[in-house]
């Protein structure tokens, strides 16, 4: 029995007619998978081509830049990489100085290190806080200065641990102020009144008199004075404590600003949006940066301007079940309209995006899930949807 006969045996006429198309599509999928594997290998080779060089060389500068990106993406995972490339030693004092300088570092990533309760992190928090010069600085401005050097974590235990260290260092540098317990009470009071006065979800804003009344027990214990409460209230009511990621010193929208506030960065593959392309759309490797409610993508990691910007407003995100690309997810419009976005054309023109869905592919399952989670967190303050996986055929 011939292989040709065996292959077609038992097939209907319709199935026999369809078979060549199936074979052709199978061949296309094999080619696409192989192309993706090649692109992934190229990315891995680029990331692996890192080696020790002289601190003043151009190659070393590239290593430092790459190290900052890794730290911003996953600070704990990056520590060994940074130490092995002689960027910063895995030592609390060295890391504290590096984070205090803060050049190109995400303040959220710094806060992630400082808020941890591992012994290494606690020692780093101590060294980092002691690097702040708080002598003869009033406590409220001192706390502003301190909290602007990183982003305070959201968990109450981490906040309290960081404020305790600040209070300890402040009291040591200002012996005439009082003890660390009193400094901690004032610092915590700053955070509390900042929330009461400036959080839009708090409808009943307390007056100074009401605020003093709320702290009656602390006053009775001598943990704080009316003068200190008044100083805190008047300062914070005029100028709220700004989260570092809410402000910029380098001009909002510049690459430096985008990278400074980056929550995640890395190589991903974006489906081509060329409407003239026939058949399956091509995939392009792009350097993606998640920053300040936007997803930026660049042709190269070192580009000065983004190729495109996707605004994460009124959008959802979900995994896409696609056998040919198992690590795909998509950002889609919740209103069935166009997603607010823009891109730079080849002639340099900036044009508005015209898409309701952006399909993106990661290199592995872990990377895909990390991106989905990071984008979901970025969308959390807004109305968003983390949808069930979507199947494609």
From Swiss-Prot:
Sorted UniProt keywords: Coiled coil, Guanine-nucleotide releasing factor
Region Disordered, annotated ranges: 1-21
Gene Ontology CC: midbody; nucleus
Sequence ranges assigned to domain SEC7 in this UniProt record: 53-239
Coiled coil recorded as keyword: yes
PANTHER family linked: GUANYL-NUCLEOTIDE EXCHANGE FACTOR, MIP16918P
Name of protein: GTP exchange factor for ARFs 1
Organism: Caenorhabditis elegans
